[in-house]
Swiss-Prot record:
Listed pathway(s): Carbohydrate metabolism; tricarboxylic acid cycle; succinate from succinyl-CoA (ligase route): step 1/1
Encoding gene (name): sucC
Gene Ontology cellular-component terms listed: cytosol; succinate-CoA ligase complex
Span of domain ATP-grasp: 9-244
Enzyme class label: ligase
Family the UniProt entry places it in: Belongs to the succinate/malate CoA ligase beta subunit family.
Function: Succinyl-CoA synthetase functions in the citric acid cycle (TCA), coupling the hydrolysis of succinyl-CoA to the synthesis of either ATP or GTP and thus represents the only step of substrate-level phosphorylation in the TCA. The beta subunit provides nucleotide specificity of the enzyme and binds the substrate succinate, while the binding sites for coenzyme A and phosphate are found in the alpha subunit.
Catalytic activity: succinate + ATP + CoA = succinyl-CoA + ADP + phosphate; GTP + succinate + CoA = succinyl-CoA + GDP + phosphate
Name this protein carries in UniProt: Succinate--CoA ligase [ADP-forming] subunit beta
Binding site for Mg(2+): 199, 213
Cofactor note: Binds 1 Mg(2+) ion per subunit.
Keyword annotations: ATP-binding, Ligase, Magnesium, Metal-binding, Nucleotide-binding, Tricarboxylic acid cycle
Chain sites annotated for binding substrate: 264, 321-323
Organism of derivation: Acidithiobacillus ferrooxidans (strain ATCC 23270 / DSM 14882 / CIP 104768 / NCIMB 8455)
Origin: domain of life: Bacteria
């Protein structure tokens, strides 16, 4: 679960990480009032969305009058912000962060993340802040510094000192960096976070280290341990179907194509989408109904797909290991009766109780296209969507 910048900064500040003075605003009037409370002569108005690239997209604005604060708030609030990470539909701006500007002498990058390869929490840092870290890792991996935290000891201060001196910080700044890294580590443990990122970590003209932007990602699998996550969750940043899917325990991600996919198992779902693209189609979604999907769960999954008006055809690809094909067939029949099936549906069933499932579908009177094998199913789905 992603958090907004203003939420991430508040949580970091609770752990002693220095952040600029800033106040969130949820209306134009609030934006003006918060700017007056902070005092001038200048402010930074930041759109709050779960996506990077806000600056290049016009979502971060430097202003030097209250009138300009009001104008920026009017232009941003309630509108979609399209960045390189959002897709063409953009993300809805429901909040702003009104922040005092900082005099920046130098920028660093610092992030804590879970390194699954090493099964360790790892700090990733570079002398170049404000950059696209993925591009830097690909083009100049030697510029990245890694600090691996041993689970038996936790994060130790000497690790921050080593990093600070490598970056050419003075003794006072190294002490600040140590406190910042300790705070990030405490926050990650407290929230079960997969990532705590500060980009950039600024060194101001006065020599202070300051978290100018922050990102926190909580582990969805640990949210049950964090009732406070309900207050942090922002439904405006997710597709409505994704929110519904989450309520029913389905793994759903909306995409840009017109072929709806219902598959059991994440790996099989990705392979299905790959084959659709290989044969000239575009998947409308990733949808994993899980290993032991019951009829009601499949019913809800089918409704999710049918609620997407872009979908022109549906591909159901089930390998019945834990999932019984006859239960899935019951879910399809139930959903078709409730929603009304008006699109071509390609069905590929293999495995447990396949024959019983296919018999149920045949006896239902539904107009279905059966497929032998995954390649055949993908080709038929693409043809159905195109014609």
């Amino acid at each position: 679960m992603n958090l907004h910048e203003y939420q991430a900064k508040r949580l970091l500040a609770e752990e002693g990480v220095p952040v600029p003075r800033a106040i969130p605003a949820f209306s134009v009037r609030e934006a003006v009032n918060q700017a007056r409370e902070l005092g001038g002569p200048a402010w930074v108005v930041k759109a709050q969305v779960h996506a990077g690239g806000r600056g290049k997209a016009g979502g971060v604005r430097m202003v030097d009058s209250i009138a300009q604060v009001e104008k920026a708030a009017q232009e941003l609030l309630g509108k979609p912000l399209v960045t390189a990470q959002t897709g063409p539909q953009g993300q809805h701006v429901a909040a702003l962060l009104i922040e005092e500007p900082s005099r920046i002498a130098r920028e660093l990058y610092l992030a804590l993340m879970v390194d699954r390869g090493q099964a360790r929490i790892t700090f990733l840092a570079t002398r170049e802040g404000g950059v696209d870290i993925e591009e830097l890792a690909a083009s100049r991996p030697e510029a990245l510094h890694r600090v691996v935290v041993e689970p038996s000891t936790g994060f130790l201060p000497f690790q921050a000192r080593q990093l600070g001196f490598q970056f050419g910080l003075d003794a006072g700044q190294v002490q600040q960096l140590t406190r910042i890294m300790q705070g990030m580590y405490r926050l990650a443990q407290r929230l079960d976070a997969l990532m705590v990122e500060i980009n950039p970590l600024a060194i101001t003209a006065e020599g202070r280290l300051l978290a100018l932007d922050a990102k926190v990602v909580m582990d969805d699998n640990a949210l049950y341990r964090h009732p406070e996550s309900d207050e942090l969750f922002d439904s405006t940043q997710q597709d409505g179907r994704e929110i519904t899917a989450r309520q029913f325990g389905l793994n759903y991600i909306s995409l840009e194509g017109n072929i709806g996919c219902m598959v059991n198992g994440a790996g099989l779902a990705m392979a299905t989408m790959d084959l659709i693209k290989l044969h000239g189609g575009e998947p409308a979604n990733f949808l994993d109904v899980g290993g032991g999907a019951a009829a009601d769960k499949v019913n809800q999954a089918f409704k999710l797909i049918l609620s997407d008006t872009r979908v022109k055809a549906i591909l159901v690809n089930i390998f019945g290991g834990i999932t019984r094909c006859d239960l899935l067939a019951e879910g399809i029949i139930q959903a078709a009766a409730e929603v009304g099936l008006h699109l071509p549906v390609v069905v590929r069933l293999e495995g447990t109780r396949k024959e019983e499932g296919m018999a149920l579908l045949r006896e239902s009177g539904l107009s279905l296209i059966t497929a032998d094998g995954l390649t055949d199913a993908a080709m038929k789905a693409v043809a159905a969507a195109q014609g």
